[in-house]
């Protein structure tokens, strides 16, 4: 049950767990706003109602409302305002899940009388409770749909026109941008502080209602050569876990033109959406200069790193056990004379840089691990030999290593980052925070791109 939007309430709840570490094969996604659009479609996917759907009076409406019953249960069994939570009130991430339906609620209430809403939190105030109950009794009327602000409308037109320019160079650029910004909360310069947009692929052109094309991954085929990049006003409440802000402005568009459109290179054909190509950014976007791609990532390295820290992959201790409680991150200088900054080296290594998402979503750990371990070892050994055989000698490389570290061009605060682990979550902040950590990451272009395609895009 997703309570961050009205559409989540009307969709209802499902007993199928989104995160299930024992599942060995993929299941159809059920992303709100994407994988179904109507209540009937969600019911066909196994979601049951939490609001009344066939009531004719306020009394019947409340009686049929699972949401009301859960709120009422809390009123009947108020939570103490002081002291520790009882052992029966489990708040751990991996707790046993209970997802009752309206038909099963009486049994649920008998077995778990203290599990009303809000779960494990103090009771709502009388005013809050009364407001919600009155709204539910009225049939939970639909709130006014948000609309783009006046300050955003002109920018929306310009940005959608930019993203859908017809040249092959622009089409390749827009695909690259989309695959890196698809989970961003886009904020336009000069618009209200809580007005955000998502970049989506739509079957409808600018000026028409958006019909998002639902694919599992952003590099999956849109199903047609005729599709459009659109900016969709995000209607849900903002929550810290998934809130990754990325700003669009005139300066940003000028920077995109500087990086991707003004350099002298040719795009002779667009890359295939076949998974062997699309899942490997070093093949799909090889026509775009490496410097342009890497500079784009470095411009907002905080956002790129935050993509996997705040994305759906980073959840729970299993995901977080691989990182230290606090560590620093720096990046290889895009102007340094190292192989990872050169097209020839990346073309040579592209087969060794492919990612497991090429193999699909069904778990085959041993076979995949062996294959990619061999590829990774080959790449690491080749990269090491290439570094040592470059113009600088090994002695200078180790003695003067800091000259290979990006300094943010003297002004970019993304040059140094600190990552904190908080038990089963994490966060990113700019700069070196705290004393010297036990470890630090030095990330070059291939590693930064692979982190994104392994843990975010793929």
Residue ranges and their predicted role:
Residues 1-458:
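Aromatic- and Gly/Pro-enriched helix-to-coil junctions and flexible linker segments
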């Amino acid at each position: 049950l997703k309570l961050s939007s009205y559409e989540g309430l009307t969709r209802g709840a499902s007993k199928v767990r989104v995160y299930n570490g024992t599942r060995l094969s993929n299941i159809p996604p059920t992303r709100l706003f994407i994988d179904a659009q109507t209540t009937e479609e969600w019911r066909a996917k196994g979601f049951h109602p939490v609001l009344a759907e066939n009531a004719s009076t306020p009394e019947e409406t409340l009686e049929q409302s699972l949401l009301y019953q859960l709120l009422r249960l809390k009123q009947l069994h108020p939570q103490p305002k002081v002291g520790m939570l009882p052992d029966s009130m489990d708040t751990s991430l991996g707790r046993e899940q209970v997802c009752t339906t309206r038909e099963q609620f009486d049994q649920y209430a008998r077995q778990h009388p203290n599990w009303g809403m809000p779960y494990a939190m103090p009771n709502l105030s009388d005013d809050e409770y009364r407001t919600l109950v009155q709204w539910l009794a009225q049939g939970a009327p639909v709130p006014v749909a948000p609309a783009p602000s006046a300050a955003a409308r002109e920018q929306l037109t310009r940005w959608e026109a930019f993203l859908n320019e017809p040249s092959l160079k622009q089409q390749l650029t827009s695909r690259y941008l989309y695959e890196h910004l698809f989970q961003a909360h886009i904020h336009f310069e000069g618009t209200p502080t809580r007005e955000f947009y998502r970049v989506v692929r739509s079957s409808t052109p600018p000026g028409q209602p958006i019909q998002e094309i639902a694919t599992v991954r952003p590099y999956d085929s849109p199903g047609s050569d005729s599709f459009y990049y659109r900016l969709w006003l995000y209607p849900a409440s903002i929550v810290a876990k998934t809130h990754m802000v990325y700003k669009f402005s005139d300066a940003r568009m000028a920077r995109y033109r500087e990086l991707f459109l003004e350099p002298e290179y040719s795009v002779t054909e667009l890359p295939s959406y076949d998974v062997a190509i699309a899942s490997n950014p070093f093949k799909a976007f090889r026509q775009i200069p490496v410097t342009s791609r890497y500079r784009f990532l470095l411009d907002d390295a905080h956002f790129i790193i935050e993509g996997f820290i705040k994305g759906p992959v980073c959840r729970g201790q299993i995901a977080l056990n691989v990182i230290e409680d606090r560590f620093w991150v720096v990046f290889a200088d895009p102007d340094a004379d190292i192989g990872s900054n050169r097209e020839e080296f990346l073309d040579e290594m592209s087969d060794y840089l492919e990612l497991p998402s090429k193999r699909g979503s069904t778990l085959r750990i041993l076979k995949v691990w062996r294959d990619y371990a061999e590829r990774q070892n080959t790449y690491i050994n080749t990269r090491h030999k290439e570094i040592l055989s470059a113009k600088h000698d090994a002695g200078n490389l180790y003695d003067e290593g800091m000259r290979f570290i990006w300094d943010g061009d003297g002004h970019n605060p993304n040059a140094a980052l600190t990552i904190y682990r908080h038990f089963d979550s994490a966060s990113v902040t700019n700069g070196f925070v705290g004393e010297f950590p036990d470890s630090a990451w030095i990330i070059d272009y291939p590693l930064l791109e692979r982190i994104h395609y392994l843990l975010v895009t793929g």
